[in-house]
Amino acid sequence: MSFLSVSRLAPKLLNSKNATYFLVAARNASASTTNLKDVLSDLIPKEQSRIKNFKQQYGKTNIGQITVDMVYGGMRGMKGLVYETSVLDPEEGIRFRGYSIPECQKLLPKAPGGEEPLPEGLFWLLVTGQVPTEEQVKWVSKEWAKRAALPSHVVTMLDNFPTNLHPMSQFSAAITALNSESSFARAYSEGVHKTKYWEFVYEDSMDLIAKLPCIAAKIYRNLYREGSSIGAIDSNLDWSHNFTNMLGYSEAQFTELMRLYLTIHSDHEGGNVSAHTSHLVGSALSDPYLSFSAAMNGLAGPLHGLANQEVLVWLTALQKEMGGEVSDERMRDYIWNTLKSGRVVPGYGHAVLRKTDPRYTCQREFALKHLPNDPMFKLVAQLYKIVPNVLLEQGKAKNPWPNVDAHSGVLLQYYGMTEMNYYTVLFGVSRALGVLAQLVWSRALGFPLERPKSMSTDGLMTLVGAKSG
């Protein structure tokens, strides 16, 4: 059994006597190795062999049917991608390499004195399938600190963007400009063998993740802090701590929130716009900078990465109209009026989930601990009591429960980050952890160019025997 397979068993056994044994078994072989690339070098041949054998035995097996509704409906529910780093269960929510968010909060290393998991630990888990040791997480922190400096042309570019250019446009453009530093693009042009592709994609991915907080902080300072300096990276601090320092936030609780935020927004299966875009563009052997920049252009769309802004706008309008504390009955009437006017309650419902998003739950727990009396949080908590019941009464929603976006903006506002246009940049920094971990594996496993078959409406009608016109 491979280490990846063993580690996937562990979450199912967490409540058993054997849980510790399996967790240790999943880590022992590489626990003494802090270099992530060395661990990958050991794992990749085993996973290649496992998948090769699987394809040989089951390559022609049918795994589902495709309906006309699926083709017209954004391919919802269509099984068409292999994505290793996370799986979204409709009832349980996201699992990172088999581990739920509560399990990750419990098992992943934390900063000294901290209570939230370090994103470096989650990245190690996403890449290897193994829960890392504290030493392995420290290695990642130092490695990213070492790689964080931005090339001068990117700094100049960021400093010369007009202030009316959206933060996500700046973010995407700067990432694209980093393509000049791509190890993969250079190696490919020199004729590197395809079995070595993953090594250079790994190097680019590590460099890019290291540099993203610097890009994001530079954008924030230029737009909202009069272009003040982001300062220097401290190699003794973790990735999130350096990020909050560069943003100009020194409160320890905000740094803890950022660790949680960057962890839970990192990955959400492979079919969402940003993950699928990265996978698609990467399949053309575009380097990680180009692939991730394309993903960020998808994330910038209102239907993907702007949802938490829409929640805050709606909450602010609700507060303005309803005043201070609002009775449950008045709140219920307001929600019904929203629905009857043809609008939705932002932050509720999800394309896949059918229960409360565990990413919402862990943010709620953070708020209950650190800001229980904040008026905006109390409003969010009140909505959590009322909205699902109203949506169930209405009878239209497949999922009446809150998602991650129903809460994240409120937490950021509480700690003083009120610039809503910037929130998607934070989302983007986080999402790099998941999609780039998968990009490394896509090249390691030799995934081909993505090229599905498209059809015209007339072609579909002919296929199913329908009359056109």
Swiss-Prot record:
CDD domains in the cross-refs: ScCit1-2_like
Broad class of the protein's primary localization: mitochondrion
Nucleotide-binding found in the keyword field: no
GO terms, molecular function: citrate (Si)-synthase activity; identical protein binding
Keywords assigned by UniProt, alphabetized: Mitochondrion, Transferase, Transit peptide, Tricarboxylic acid cycle
Function, as annotated: Key enzyme of the Krebs tricarboxylic acid cycle which catalyzes the synthesis of citrate from acetyl coenzyme A and oxaloacetate.
The protein's name in its UniProt record: Citrate synthase, mitochondrial
